[in-house]
Amino acid sequence: MRLKNKPWANELVEEHPESALDRPNPAEKIDWAARFGNDKPIEIEVGSGKGQFITTLAKQHPDRNFVAMEIQKTAAGIILKKKLDEGLDNLQILCADAANLVAYFGENSTSKIYLNFSDPWPKSRHEKRRLTYKDFLAKYQAVLTGDGLIEFKTDNSGLFAYSVKSMNNYGMHFDFMSVDLHHESEEIVEKNVETEYEHKFASKGQPIYCLHAGFLAK
């Protein structure tokens, strides 16, 4: 969902190049170890919205590095404000298109990718834009380590069914799958980190679909 333009958020991104990259040149490799100041494992959320999910993870896991990849500059600015307000040194913001994922991260550089409530692009002519289309799966496979995982959540049953089929056809394995995440075991529910969108729709009784999937050995 596109957010209303907020000039302050756009300006904030421009004022903090040490914390946020605004559409960097894909031809120039990003030195993530230098940006984080360490070489801890990196986890990426592709499409971070207002950042509730990724900032919560960053607070919970100071031993990991996180990148919020968000194409909307206003959304990137909102996430950046949360990062700065909460002093999250293990979070970087990348305002860029996921189509350039491999250029920005390089091969075997990432331990986990989160896809939360991505645009379903329901029309068949837009299939290639879905973040679980085979071409995107190939990009994820390239940047993930051998045991890396994709964690995917959606409220859209059609996108979930499509994603299961797409990943299965790609030869991926599934470590977890649920068609009603918020009614799983207490342990699973407690470990789940909600997005803003997820909280809104789950509170109305909308089932949340979820899967964790990985690739066969490279």
UniProtKB/Swiss-Prot annotation:
Record's GO cellular component, any one? tRNA methyltransferase complex
Query: Which E.C. number(s) belong to this protein?
Result: 2.1.1.33
Keywords (alphabetical) are: Methyltransferase, S-adenosyl-L-methionine, Transferase, tRNA processing
Q: Which PANTHER family match?
A: 3-DEOXY-D-MANNO-OCTULOSONIC-ACID TRANSFERASE/TRNA GUANINE-N 7 - -METHYLTRANSFERASE, PENTACOTRIPEPTIDE-REPEAT REGION OF PRORP DOMAIN-CONTAINING PROTEIN
Q: Which InterPro entries match?
A: SAM-dependent_MTases_sf (IPR029063), tRNA_(Gua-N-7)_MeTrfase_Trmb (IPR003358), tRNA_methyltr_TrmB_bact (IPR055361)
What Pfam families does UniProt report for this protein, alphabetically?
A: Methyltransf_4
Gene name in the database record:
trmB
Q: What is this protein called?
A: tRNA (guanine-N(7)-)-methyltransferase
Q: What is the lineage of its organism?
A: Bacteria, Bacillati, Bacillota, Bacilli, Lactobacillales
